[in-house]
Amino acid sequence: MDFICCRNVLVENTFQRNYDDNVTIKAFNGKTDYVTAHTASDGSFTDASIWTVYYLAQNKFDVYDYEIRNCVFWADKAHNMLVGPEARGIAFRNIRFHDNIVLENRQNDGIYPGAMAVMIADNGTFEDIAFENIIVEDIDGGKVFCAHFTNAWAFDGLYGQWARNITLRNIAYTGTRATPSWIRGRNDAQSIDGVTIGNFTVNGTPVTDGSGPHLEINEYVRNVTFE
């Protein structure tokens, strides 16, 4: 499910097995080189869908008020629960995933990791994003959680502006194959401010800091609270 420039969204009681992302929340899908390749000499677009992209780019539709709950996710390749990276300078806020189960995730690379992920990209801002009461089974690969700055799928090669108020609460991973989760700001300006982690467990053991074997938090993440 790709939700593009949507607001006031509820997803509940679904079972999803997808090759790509199970649920992704973004501004719109497209890259500058694609738009250029489908623009005629008179300035018209040869792909009709680009008119939608152009309209959204001009009007800056913010993305907010999502609840994704009571779902079971299996992703053969990509993320299970993703916010970003296509943002195009708009604001993402008030997004909550809760009471979901992850059966499978196999994506283990340096750009797109994370059964749960926030990709802070494309000049967007990201605020009040929560993952709560999530069970992650012994996935084949990838990370349980990842929040980081990237310019993947960014129209102008831009990273995100900032992120704040990210919550992980009652996250239970059981298994041995997931690689360590990470939360990474990019620099002093492009930072993550306000992270709350409560009862994040790996094989029943609580994760209590950001420098252990299961979670890395870098110096550009501020105001981190472990509950």
Where are the predicted features?
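Extracellular/periplasmic carbohydrate-active domains that bind, remodel
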Residues: 1-227
